[in-house]
C-alpha cells in the first residue's frame, strides 16, 4: 500500500499525489495575486447560470456529474454527498475513490436515486486510485478497464453503455513528480486512444473524469512555470490533442466557452491556491461530435467543496 505522506509526495509506483509547482513571482506579482484572491482582480471564476436547452431549443433530458473526490471516506466527511443530493444528477462519476468495493461507506450505497452502482479499484493497492459510476437508470452493459493488462491493474476506467451513447469515466495516470511515470503515461495515452476510438465507432461517446492534463495555456494559472511538470508537458498536451483528433472528441467546456479564463477544476491544498484560484483544468467532459447538437451546457462547479478538485456537470438533450 502506498504511504500517504504529505500532499506532493510520490506513491510507490511513481504516481504523484497532487502537486502544483508555481513559477517564481516578483513582489509585484505577489501583491497582484493578493488583490485577485480578494476578488479585486480578474482571476476569480463565476459559474454562469445553467443553460438547460440545446441549440435547437430541446430541453435537457440527461444530467451527468463527475468529481475526483480524493478519497471517498474523507469526501463524505467533508459533506460531498450533500452537494450530490442537491445537484441531483442522473449519473454520477467519481474518481480517485481510494476505496475497495467491500469497504464502501453505507451512506454511498444508500444514496437515493442512484441505485445502480459500479466500482473499480486496484486489487493489490488499498487506498489508491479507483473509480465509480452511479446511475438512476440501469445501463445496458458495464465493463471495466481498457482491455490491456498493463493498464488495467489500477482501477482507472469504467464503461457503461446506454441506449443512445456510451459513457466512459476515467482517472488517467499522473506522470508523477520528476516525470518518473511519463513514459508509462504516454503508453497509456496511446492505448486509451485506441480503446476509445473503437468504442466511438459503434456508438456516440461521452468521456468524463480526471484526465490529468491541462490542454492549453488558458487551462492553468501558471503555464510558463509548469511546462516541465506533470500535467502540462508537451508530451501530455500532444497526447490529449491526438485523442481529440483521432477518436474524434470535442471538449464540451471549450466548445461552449472557448475564451473563458480562470476556469479550473483542481487546486493544490498548499499555498492557499484555491482562495487565490491558482489552479488547473484537469477534469473534462469530452463528446463525440454527433452529440454536440444535444449539448446544452458544460459546468464547472468551482464553489463545491470536499476535495482538491471541484465537480463538473454536463447537460444533454437526448
From Swiss-Prot:
It is found in: Nucleus; Nucleus, Nucleolus; Nucleus speckle; Endoplasmic reticulum. GO terms for biological process: base-excision repair; DNA recombination; DNA repair; positive regulation of gene expression via chromosomal CpG island demethylation; regulation of apoptotic process; regulation of mRNA stability. This is DNA repair nuclease/redox regulator APEX1. It comes from Gorilla gorilla gorilla. It comes from the Eukaryota. The modification N6-acetyllysine is found at residues 6-7, 27, 31-32, 35, 197. It is an enzyme of class 3 (hydrolase). Phosphorylated. Phosphorylation by kinase PKC or casein kinase CK2 results in enhanced redox activity that stimulates binding of the FOS/JUN AP-1 complex to its cognate binding site. AP-endodeoxyribonuclease activity is not affected by CK2-mediated phosphorylation. Phosphorylation of Thr-233 by CDK5 in response to MPP(+)/MPTP (1-methyl-4-phenylpyridinium) reduces AP-endodeoxyribonuclease activity resulting in accumulation of DNA damage and contributing to neuronal death. Residues 289-318 are annotated as: Mitochondrial targeting sequence (MTS). Residues 23-33 are annotated as: Necessary for interaction with NPM1 and for efficient rRNA binding. Multifunctional protein that plays a central role in the cellular response to oxidative stress. The two major activities of APEX1 are DNA repair and redox regulation of transcriptional factors. Functions as an apurinic/apyrimidinic (AP) endodeoxyribonuclease in the DNA base excision repair (BER) pathway of DNA lesions induced by oxidative and alkylating agents. Initiates repair of AP sites in DNA by catalyzing hydrolytic incision of the phosphodiester backbone immediately adjacent to the damage, generating a single-strand break with 5'-deoxyribose phosphate and 3'-hydroxyl ends. The N-terminus contains the redox activity while the C-terminus exerts the DNA AP-endodeoxyribonuclease activity; both function are independent in their actions. An unconventional mitochondrial targeting sequence (MTS) is harbored within the C-terminus, that appears to be masked by the N-terminal sequence containing the nuclear localization signal (NLS), that probably blocks the interaction between the MTS and Tom proteins.
